[in-house]
Amino acid sequence: MDPSQNPNVFHATTIVCVRRGEHVAIAGDGQVTLGHTVMKGNARKVRRLGRDGQVLAGFAGAAADAFTLFELFEAKLEKHGQLQRAAVELAKDWRTERRLGKLEALLAVADKETSLIISGTGDVIEPEDGIIAIGSGGSYALSAARALMAHTELDARTIASEAIGIAGDICIYTNRNVVVEEL
């Protein structure tokens, strides 16, 4: 089945990461959807990880798979202590371990210097413009964040929050209950 047609996959959230100046923010909505039913409106899908909480992470995808990825990424981060190294090591594991290859989730991760997407195929992608948007409302949030970056002086936190709000107005799998973490 095409993932876009599966009611249990990638329809649970929108995450956006915005980097502006010396600041980076990751925001996520709070809606959890199972099939065509909203199960929860205040889920927390954005977290601080690593020593002293210096890495931000947000997940989109099947909930159990996303939590598994969070745990695996956090273990790599604790072991290697550096965002890019942890992401690459997780991607290596993802490509070699069968159980990981079937996980249907994406992670957006960021520290003070770097923002990355860790994809469901084990790819590690660094955006060229400092903006990441994943999940069911990702395209809407990405468009909103890019417009706000280009035409306003808003800070990273505000842009991330507004982008989720705009996505929440358009995407039925996203709400306006926004959680933001910032470095």
Curated annotation (Swiss-Prot):
| Keyword Transcription regulation tagged | no
Residues annotated as the enzyme's active site: T13
GO CC annotation, single: HslUV protease complex
Q: What does the record give as EC number?
A: 3.4.25.2
Q: Name one GO biological process term.
A: proteolysis involved in protein catabolic process
What is the superkingdom listed in this entry's lineage? Bacteria
Q: How is its activity regulated?
A: Allosterically activated by HslU binding.
Keyword Thylakoid appears in the UniProt entry: no
Record's subcellular location: Cytoplasm
Per UniProt, the enzyme's principal EC class comes to hydrolase
The record's section on NCBIfam families has: ATP_dep_HslV, PRK05456.1
Q: Which family does it belong to?
A: Belongs to the peptidase T1B family. HslV subfamily.
**HAMAP family assigned to the protein according to its UniProt record, in alphabetical order:** HslV
Q: What is this protein's record name?
A: ATP-dependent protease subunit HslV
Lineage of the organism: Bacteria, Pseudomonadati, Pseudomonadota, Gammaproteobacteria, Lysobacterales
